[in-house]
């Protein structure tokens, strides 16, 4: 399958790296092009080789021509997207079948421009919504609702957010195992990202968001909890939450405080999640019973790393429905691996 990556930033590069680590590059997937603001293949090779958080890429890297990037012997054309809309990109000429839309800009119906340019499908590496009913965007969380994918109908799909990918599998287990969720509040303690400031700067819409990322804990908004309702409709209206952006470069954690529909216990909840991690959520949910911290989940490929030692039950007498669970995630690497998994899934449905 011929693939293009539009946007060669954090997620775009890590998706390519994940393909290489999974030994899919040049075999199951022919990444024919990457699009960014330049075609400087030498610089792209440098960015892939040296990563301040994820470490050095294991594949060989070179630039045999100014606009040709070579990764592990696989040649990729570098396309300059400066000033171009998705509909103006050379997908027809390059024979592109699937575009991974990783710019963060076209997370709506505008991503249909890739189809106009000749691609057959689009995966958006961000939460996405369409305001045009004739151009729907289907949200898929691997391990949770990929069975809803319809190849004939869903030409553009969203991989949701990294936080939704962490939270939704945990919620899915509680629903599938029968304890249910009556209501819940989620907090994500989230590493800073490229949208934040290195020093205090202008942020007219979000004053706190303009403060220096590396020296502050910054309250922020997130739609991740509400988005769970898109992939698990029975939770719609039951979950909401907020974020705290913290001074770590990657490695985040979700804290879900919730009330179950049926009485249960910490031991039972842990058992449910352990069972799921070994069966229907294998490869998506990891069960951990060790004393880990955020640095320990860097470069962990799972969507959600459940921390069984952190599970709490309200200590009121006879209270058997009020709990807190905690699950970690590498908001970069885990998410990028799910983009690749979604691509694999879609390729099998052609």
Curated annotation (Swiss-Prot):
Keywords: Cytoplasm, Glycolysis, NAD, Nucleotide-binding, Oxidoreductase. InterPro entries: GlycerAld/Erythrose_P_DH, GlycerAld_3-P_DH_AS, GlycerAld_3-P_DH_cat, GlycerAld_3-P_DH_NAD(P)-bd, Glyceraldehyde-3-P_DH_1, NAD(P)-bd_dom_sf. The keyword Cytoplasm applies. GO terms for biological process: glucose metabolic process; glycolytic process. It catalyses: D-glyceraldehyde 3-phosphate + phosphate + NAD(+) = (2R)-3-phospho-glyceroyl phosphate + NADH + H(+). Transmembrane segments: none annotated. Pathway: Carbohydrate degradation; glycolysis; pyruvate from D-glyceraldehyde 3-phosphate: step 1/5. It is an enzyme of class 1 (oxidoreductase). The keyword DNA repair does not apply. The active site is at residue 162. NAD(+) binds at residues 10-11, 36, 82, 125, 331. Homotetramer. Catalyzes the oxidative phosphorylation of glyceraldehyde 3-phosphate (G3P) to 1,3-bisphosphoglycerate (BPG) using the cofactor NAD. The first reaction step involves the formation of a hemiacetal intermediate between G3P and a cysteine residue, and this hemiacetal intermediate is then oxidized to a thioester, with concomitant reduction of NAD to NADH. The reduced NADH is then exchanged with the second NAD, and the thioester is attacked by a nucleophilic inorganic phosphate to produce BPG. NCBIfam families: GAPDH-I. This is Glyceraldehyde-3-phosphate dehydrogenase. The lineage of its organism: Bacteria, Pseudomonadati, Spirochaetota, Spirochaetia, Spirochaetales. The gene is gap.
């Amino acid at each position: 399958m011929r693939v293009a990556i539009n946007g060669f930033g954090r997620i775009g590069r890590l998706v390519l790296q994940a393909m290489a680590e999974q030994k899919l590059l040049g075999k199951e997937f022919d990444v024919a092009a990457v699009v960014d603001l330049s075609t400087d293949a030498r610089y792209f090779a440098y960015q892939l080789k040296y990563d301040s958080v994820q470490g050095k890429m294991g594949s060989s890297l070179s630039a045999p021509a100014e606009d040709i990037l070579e990764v592990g012997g696989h040649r990729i054309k570098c396309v300059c997207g400066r000033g171009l809309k998705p509909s103006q990109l050379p997908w027809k000429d390059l024979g592109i079948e699937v575009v991974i839309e990783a710019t963060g800009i076209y997370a709506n119906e505008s991503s249909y421009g890739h189809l106009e340019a000749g691609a057959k499908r689009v995966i958006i590496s961000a939460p996405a919504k369409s305001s045009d009913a004739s151009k729907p965007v289907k949200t898929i969380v691997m391990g949770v609702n990929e069975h809803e994918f319809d190849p004939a109908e869903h030409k553009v799909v969203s991989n949701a957010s990294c936080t939704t990918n962490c939270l939704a599998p945990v919620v899915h287990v509680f629903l599938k195992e029968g304890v249910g969720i009556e209501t819940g509040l989620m907090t994500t303690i989230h590493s800073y990202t490229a949208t934040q400031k290195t020093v205090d700067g202008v942020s007219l819409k979000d004053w706190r968001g303009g403060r220096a990322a590396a020296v502050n804990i910054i309250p922020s908004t997130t739609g991740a909890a509400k988005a769970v309702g898109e992939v698990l409709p029975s939770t719609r209206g039951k979950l909401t939450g907020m974020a705290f952006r913290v001074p770590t470069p990657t490695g985040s954690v979700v804290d879900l405080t919730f009330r179950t529909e049926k009485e249960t216990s910490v031991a039972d909840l842990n058992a449910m999640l352990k069972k799921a991690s070994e069966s229907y959520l294998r490869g998506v949910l990891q069960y951990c019973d060790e004393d880990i911290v955020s640095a320990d989940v860097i470069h962990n490929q799972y969507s959600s790393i459940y921390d069984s030692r952190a599970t709490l039950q309200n200590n009121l007498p006879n209270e058997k429905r009020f709990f807190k669970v905690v699950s970690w995630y590498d908001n970069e690497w885990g998410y990028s691996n799910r983009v690749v998994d979604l691509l694999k899934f879609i390729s099998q449905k052609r």
